[in-house]
Design a protein with these regions (language model features):
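N-terminal Rossmann-like dinucleotide-binding module
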Residues: 2-45
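Short beta->alpha connector loops
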Residues: 13-16, 68-71, 92-94
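A residue-level signal for conserved active-site and pocket-lining positions in enzyme catalytic cores
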Residues: 12, 34, 57, 87, ...
Length: 314
């Protein structure tokens, strides 16, 4: 006999959370509310932008709550009135206090985009690429008051391709996380899960990205710069200075050779690429975006922007 459906409150904000919300909406359990970050003004026109999770929740006619802070008394009272069985959290954007986590009958399950205890924090997907990891994954865990410190429920590994960008890996992990959450709920209901405490001595961290993280230091090796390009696509992007303008680099290829010139100097120009000296090896650049312009293939960039051998990126 199937257990009765659980009454679930879902917490999430960016696109990473969408597959998890979809799988809940399509499943047997009842999503009684969706909690997401408040609408924000963005861009030069200060246009009000709603979160991807709110957009999906509106499409399904779900009850939406958007507290500035989850510790607000009015929000906590609203949660108690809903009387949920479980919270499911995926990239919500706030740490939930103990007073909130204690409300649901069966606690709160978080979907995190790393193999905890490695890469706790806000930007695990970018940092696994930047650090040259070959494998990452997703974790479901019981939430406590710490940042990604709760007991582990299930984990699933996801290999990282050698040309993988943060954008592509993000989408694969979001999908894997949703499937893992579905499996986690089934096993919780069947009593087949034993939460495992994390080994905090093995914890590593993935702090939020800053725009300046994208600045390319050409004295680093081509492999490290290539990882930086892939890790910071789409944001903040990996960028350099050309003619006092910011130039984002989206696609590179590593060419092995001993250092022979000044890091950042253009050493070869093809019809659809340029090769730039680094601290170790060459980086072949194939796709760029000049500040205030659209992303373009290097072939198109060269047509309108004179670059010569010896040009130095800073």
């Amino acid at each position: 006999m199937n257990p009765p459906p659980w009454r679930i409150v879902f917490f999430g904000t960016p696109s990473f959370a969408l597959p998890t919300l979809r799988i809940l909406v399509e499943g047997r359990d009842e999503v009684i509310a969706v909690v997401t970050q408040p609408d924000r003004e963005k861009g030069r026109g200060r246009k009000v932008v709603i979160s991807p999770v709110k957009e999906l929740a509106l499409q399904h006619g779900l009850n939406i709550l958007q507290p500035e802070k989850a510790k607000e008394e009015a929000f906590q009272e609203a949660m108690k009135i809903l009387n949920p069985d479980l919270f499911v959290v995926a990239a919500y954007g706030q740490i939930l206090p103990k007073s909130v986590l204690s409300i649901p009958k069966f606690g709160a399950v978080n979907v995190h985009a790393s193999l905890l205890p490695k890469y706790r924090g806000a930007a695990p997907i970018a940092w696994v690429i930047l650090n040259g990891e070959k494998v990452t994954g997703v974790t479901t865990m019981m939430m406590d008051e710490g940042m990604d410190t709760g007991d582990i429920l299930l984990q699933a590994e996801v290999p990282i391709g050698h040309e993988e960008t943060c954008e592509r890996l993000h989408d694969r992990l979001a999908s894997s996380g949703a499937q893992l959450l579905s499996e986690t709920l089934e096993k919780m209901k069947a009593g087949e899960i034993r939460p495992i405490p994390q080994d905090h001595s093995k914890a590593t961290y993935a702090p939020p990205l800053k725009k300046e993280d994208g600045y390319i230091d050409w004295k680093k090796g081509a492999r490290e710069i290539d990882r930086q390009i892939r890790a910071f696509t789409p944001w903040p992007g990996a960028f350099t200075k050309w003619n006092d303008q910011l130039l984002k680099i989206f696609k590179g290829e590593i060419k092995e050779r001993m250092p022979a010139g000044k890091p950042g100097a253009v050493v070869w120009i093809g019809t659809d690429f340029i090769e730039v000296e680094t601290g170790e090896g060459l980086l072949r650049i194939q796709e760029v975006q000049l500040e205030g312009r659209k992303k373009m293939a290097l072939r198109d960039f060269l047509l309108g922007h004179p670059v010569s051998v010896g040009t130095v990126f800073h």
